[in-house]
From Swiss-Prot:
Function text: Odorant receptor. Activated by (+) and (-)-limonene.
Family affiliation: Belongs to the G-protein coupled receptor 1 family.
Entry annotated with the keyword NAD: no
Positions of transmembrane segments: 31-51, 59-79, 100-120, 145-165, 196-216, 239-259, 273-293
Keyword set, alphabetical order: Cell membrane, Disulfide bond, G-protein coupled receptor, Membrane, Olfaction, Receptor, Sensory transduction, Transducer, Transmembrane, Transmembrane helix
Protein known as: Olfactory receptor 2V1
Primary gene name: Or2v1
Bilayer topology: Multi-pass membrane protein
PANTHER family linked: OLFACTORY RECEPTOR
GO BP field: G protein-coupled receptor signaling pathway; sensory perception of smell
Cellular component aspect of the GO annotation: membrane; plasma membrane
Lineage summary: Eukaryota, Metazoa, Chordata, Craniata, Vertebrata
Length: 315
């Protein structure tokens, strides 16, 4: 328990947040809460559809259900505390609460980054090696892929949480952010953080750049396979399948790399807070919409579920 006992552990920290009490910020807060509600409902609905409809019991939808679960946990880790602080006017967070928020946040973002990379590999196998797909992406392999994403993400979260909470915070208690994010917290440390910066960069390389390189390689090969297809309809179907994943990848990795891979001298709290909204709130809302509205199987499962509910209510 020693890592929790330093100069800031008694009082904790103050989250300055992203909203003030102005009319404009009240409107922005209402918008964020609407986005949070859509993210919550969308991801829960997508998980239920994938779980209950046998037609969606395929590797791609299994990975999608894991992605939705990660997104669901991510928004629930950040937004409720932000809402309580804004509505109550109390912006404090305990030292232990800050550490727990960091642990969950880093674990979920790391897991999602790895899973998105491995989902690109799944699309590559499905398009380039369709005959071998059932063997290469068996149930055992799918469980191993999902399990490894969760395991490495959780390990990354524990490492960064322990390292961040071990630093002394004897100066300002004001975190210029709406949640405990590592780069914002490090600015308050009254010790040399160069070793931690190196550790953070190494974790980001493994959890962001490595899966991103898998995505780039997979889609380069997918593009080559698509161009070799003789049927225009097959090319269109393959590109439609991949476009949803590419949209989700662009939103997630664009925001995460902007926050974690920039040199410290180029970081500005106002920019970081706005960009963080993208992968903590906006991406979890957009993912179920991106993957469902452009997907016939998911929309078919949704219509089937609604029809079942309608018939049940009539009886």
């Amino acid at each position: 328990m020693g890592i929790w006992l330093n100069e800031s552990s008694v009082d904790g920290f103050i989250l300055l947040g992203i909203f003030s009490q102005s009319q404009t910020d009240l409107l922005l807060f209402s918008t964020v809460m609407l986005v949070f509600t859509v993210a919550l409902c969308g991801n829960v609905l997508l998980i239920l559809l994938i779980y209950t409809d046998p037609r969606l019991h395929t590797p791609m939808y299994f990975f999608l259900s894991q992605l939705s679960l990660m997104d669901l946990m991510l928004v629930c880790n950040i937004v409720p505390k932000m809402a309580v602080n804004f509505l109550s006017g109390r912006k404090s967070i305990s030292f232990a609460g800050c550490g727990i928020q960091i642990g969950f946040f880093v674990s979920l973002v790391g897991s999602e980054g790895l899973l998105l990379g491995l989902m690109a590999y799944d699309r590559y196998v499905a398009i380039s090696h369709p005959l071998h797909y059932p063997i290469l992406m068996s149930q055992k392999v799918c469980l191993q892929i999902a399990g490894s994403s969760w395991a490495f993400g959780i390990l990354d979260g524990i490492i960064q949480m322990v390292a961040a909470m071990s630093l002394p915070y004897c100066g300002s208690r004001y975190i210029d952010h709406f949640f405990c994010e590592v780069p914002a917290l490090l600015k308050l440390a009254c010790a040399d953080t160069s070793l931690f910066d190196t550790l953070l960069f190494a974790c980001c390389v493994f959890m962001l750049l490595l899966p991103f390189s898998i995505i780039v390689t997979s889609y380069a090969r997918i593009l080559g396979a698509v161009l070799r297809m003789h049927s225009a309809q097959s090319r269109k179907k393959a590109l439609a399948t991949c476009s949803s994943h590419l949209t989700a990848v662009s939103l997630f990795y664009g925001a995460a790399m902007f926050i974690y891979l920039r040199p410290r001298r180029y970081r500005a709290p106002s920019h970081d807070k706005v960009v963080s909204i993208f992968y903590t709130v906006l991406t979890p809302m957009l993912n179920p919409l991106i993957y469902s509205l452009r997907n016939r199987e998911v929309m078919g499962a949704l219509r089937k579920g609604l029809d079942r509910c309608r018939v049940g209510s009539q009886h």
